[in-house]
Every structure is written in C-alpha cells, then in structure tokens.
C-alpha cells in the first residue's frame, strides 16, 4: 500500500492566491479557488503515475479555525486574519470537487488537517505501508521516516528548485539541523511565529 495524503487546506489557500478572481456567470458565485484547486489536484494525480504511484489517496482539510489547540491556548493563530469573504463560499465547493474526483475528503471537528494527516500516516506506516504527504508545512516534517516509509512532497514552485521537491530525512536535517524525530523539540524551544506560539 502507498497512501497519498494531500494537505487540502494548504492547496485551497495556494489556489486562492495564485489565480485572479473568477466568478460563475449565472449567479456571481466566486469559483477561482475551486478552479485552481481542481487543476492542482488533477496535475498531482497525473504527475504521480508510474511504478511508485499511490494505491490510496485522501485530501485532508481543516474543519475550521477553531481547534482543541485554541481551547488550550486562545492565542494560537490569533494573529491570522479571517479567510477572505470571497473564499468562504468556496470551502464546501472544494470538498465537493474532491469527492467528484472520487477521492475521500476528510475533516474532523476540533482538529486541524495536520492532526488527521499525522494519524493516518502513522497508522499506514504501522500497517507496513508507504506514505507520501503532499504539503510544505514544516510541522509535518517531524513525521518523515529515515527509511522512507513516510516522506513528504512539496509541490510549491520555488526559484531554482524543481516543481516537485521530495522531502526525506536528509532534507529535514538540512532545514532544522536535527533528525525528523527531534523537529518537535526544536519547535518547542524556538516557538513558532507562524502559529503565534512563543
């Protein structure tokens, strides 16, 4: 088994910011993010065909901005602005588009996509499977396994880098100076300005 877990929330915001506004002519509904999201999802599935192609796939979404972390620490991500008004009606449409691809769309109240991705990744690894996490989220790098049973794929284009960049234990070490299992300790010591964690 080779499980592909896509950080759907990340894909939504990338698609939203990458494309100009687009609305449906019949009713003016914003759909630019949905168009970009589906194009990205289609490209991903096409790019990963071959001998090492995933046998299973799911797209994981944040349920909402509120999670068990905000209950424990109210300042968690408190500095982030709310989602743009024209993006909000596109959230359910991206889930529907995912299901239209016949791909499971998974989210759970009070949990972030990262939590669900980590749970599924560890369960698949423990069952002897291989896991690819499609995300550029540094928080997920702690899941990368030196034996390659869990690795990441960053599909965000960056100058001077390939369009699809694999992240294994070596890349995690290059970024943090520690092995993946120590990333959580580095973040605990350094905090995380992105998530407003001191």
Segments from the language model and where they lie:
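Extended two-metal-dependent nuclease catalytic cores across DNA- and RNA-processing enzymes
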Residues: 21-24, 78-198
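Non-catalytic, usually N-terminal nucleic-acid engagement modules in DNA/RNA processing proteins
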Residues: 1-75
